[in-house]
Amino acid sequence: MLRITVKTLQQRASFHHSFKHISVPDLHTRAQNDQTNCYCQEINARLPSKTDPLDPHIKLPHRTPNYNKHVLLLSPGDRFAQPWKVAWNHNLDTNTNRPYNAISKLRSHLGGSPGILINAVHLQNEFIPRPKQHDEWLYFFVIPDMKLYVIKETDIEEFASFLDEGAIQAPKLSFQDYLSGKAKASQQVHEVHHRKLTRFQGETFLRDWNLVCGHYKRDAKCGEMGPDIIAAFQDEKLFPENNLALISHIGGHIFAGNVIFYKLFGREKMQNKLDSLWFGKVYPHNLKLLCENLENGKIIDEMYRGGISMN
């Protein structure tokens, strides 16, 4: 039987769920390490020569961005398409083709509001509608609204105002600062004002999310590992009722194996409260252990990057 050391979880914001830290014992860790070393060798054999190799010994930092909303641009095409490998540029803001050119436009109209994350995702199941190839509409899923907004490109500026709700308090570390490796940011809280609010209806989809980084052109390590982790979710039937998707760069590409879980709380009351849990150094062979413990309210400390509560 696997014995686990338990201690109270320390976090900058109280979670809606009750979680405890766990530490995997040495005996189990040694067995995992053997599998990890073999897997890393396999990944490194697939990487382009200019990509830094996957090193399982890199220490995982316990640091995540502070944010209020996560805006996910849905990639067109079925789950067998590979936009995460082909269409997502190294920097998504440089994409000039639809629908990805909407990301730089949206970010520009938001005026650098640091409390809003923007990523592209490619869905791996069919719980919410996805755009078709060459679709004239843009599909944005917004967390914690838990709503899908289908808008026209001409609506982006007003959609930015809607997302920002006219004003937003800036957290201490913006997502862009976080991705660029800045550990510190201004402590000053300021407001960003938009001239107009337009209400977008959206369609509600109350499901948890599993997001796996697979941004190949940002770092081939993530691009190679992401589909392997997706396959492990599917083969092991882990959280099969959750939305499952590959996501563009969320930091941590040096150690790779990055997964975000969004876990709803109080969905029966339509409260849209949820916990955001970030993990790194997740491999196909340790994913089941991570998910089973998470389902039981336990967070494996060795893979935990951090998290926040959202509502």
Swiss-Prot record:
Pfam family, one: Suc_Fer-like
One GO CC term on file: mitochondrial matrix
Taxonomic superkingdom: Eukaryota
GO BP terms: cell redox homeostasis; protein-containing complex assembly
Phenotype when the gene is knocked out: Increases frequency of mitochondrial genome loss.
InterPro entries hit by this protein: Aim32/Apd1-like (IPR009737), Thioredoxin-like_sf (IPR036249)
Signal peptide location: none
SUPFAM superfamilies for the chain: Thioredoxin-like
Family: Belongs to the AIM32 family.
Official protein name in the record: Altered inheritance of mitochondria protein 32
Gene source species: Saccharomyces cerevisiae (strain ATCC 204508 / S288c) (Baker's yeast)
